[in-house]
Amino acid sequence: MSLFARQLQSLTASGIRTQQVRLASTEVSFHTKPCKLHKLDNGPNTSVTLNREDALKYYRDMQVIRRMESAAGNLYKEKKIRGFCHLYSGQEACAVGMKAAMTEGDAVITAYRCHGWTWLLGATVTEVLAELTGRVAGNVHGKGGSMHMYTKNFYGGNGIVGAQQPLGAGVALAMKYREQKNVCVTLYGDGAANQGQLFEATNMAKLWDLPVLFVCENNGFGMGTTAERSSASTEYYTRGDYVPGIWVDGMDILAVREATKWAKEYCDSGKGPLMMEMATYRYHGHSMSDPGTSYRTREEIQEVRKTRDPITGFKDRIITSSLATEEELKAIDKEVRKEVDEALKIATSDGVLPPEALYADIYHNTPAQEIRGATIDETIVQPFKTSADVLKSIGRA
């Protein structure tokens, strides 16, 4: 027992009232659920450490994604976002945990739940929300919308189920060709795990030992179909056959971080691809047009929110371990709320690209050329090469 603790004990024994003192921790160890392994002799550590700085950052990052997605859901209901919109609420620990393990030069490619990843890899909250509403301030000036955002080393959302799987292998091939010590994190859902291109991509990746992590974010439902009804084998981490795999608790950010670190080291050592399955859950329907309650009950969703929510669980951990106080986390919540609210103002008021921008951003570094129009007889001369050129022409660089 420390001298400080003995003194407190002595004072209490003497009948003197003492006030509880909580000393802030700087680093704490936690235990995570063991990973399930496929064709591997060992896996990630179950004893992990977390320092105060990282704890506050991870909490803030997950809260930004949660609040940003909530804002997007409201914008869709107000018909300020049109078309498709798939939300990531409930799965925040997957993205933030993986990002925490990535290093400079690592790449990510995913499907249509891409808003959080776009922000994590460099876009601002304003750029994400403004892209969703089709505004100039958007990540790609409003041209991409919900499913087609990108930033440096983020190869986007992809609107076709499973289309990103072979593309991720291609990014990894480029990394190996350039002799980069990096990996491409290729994400897909349990619904896309049955797509033929995944098996083609894993075959080529293993054949050439490409540094690619094939990550299945198993949220239990492919649209409205349960994994058990769509897959003969629901152990997605084993589906690579000759590609080793690990199963991870995707609701635990620390388990995700440690597993991704381990997986990245595996790929960096030249052993080739690895499959990861993140067991997670989405709170909303498949998309905003799906209420998400025809194939599951509201009670099921509430039970997950109550017992497995990634943000609440992490919050409880860092408070009870004295890495942060409840007041500090409330201050972060307030700061995040303000950031998202400010972004919403721009996302709902900024202008849109003029019609001339429709034909920009088609070809890279080429002179103006004729582009086929809506009919075979219609041709249009490309007046601007990029949207930036269009904005410059109207005085908005």
From Swiss-Prot:
It catalyses: N(6)-[(R)-lipoyl]-L-lysyl-[protein] + pyruvate + H(+) = N(6)-[(R)-S(8)-acetyldihydrolipoyl]-L-lysyl-[protein] + CO2. Gene3D superfamilies: 3.40.50.970. Mg(2+) binds at residues 190, 219. GO terms for biological process: pyruvate decarboxylation to acetyl-CoA. Pfam families: E1_dh. Thiamine diphosphate binds at residues 112-113, 159, 161, 190-192, 219, 286. It comes from the Eukaryota. The pyruvate dehydrogenase complex catalyzes the overall conversion of pyruvate to acetyl-CoA and CO(2). It contains multiple copies of three enzymatic components: pyruvate dehydrogenase (E1), dihydrolipoamide acetyltransferase (E2) and lipoamide dehydrogenase (E3). This is Probable pyruvate dehydrogenase E1 component subunit alpha, mitochondrial.
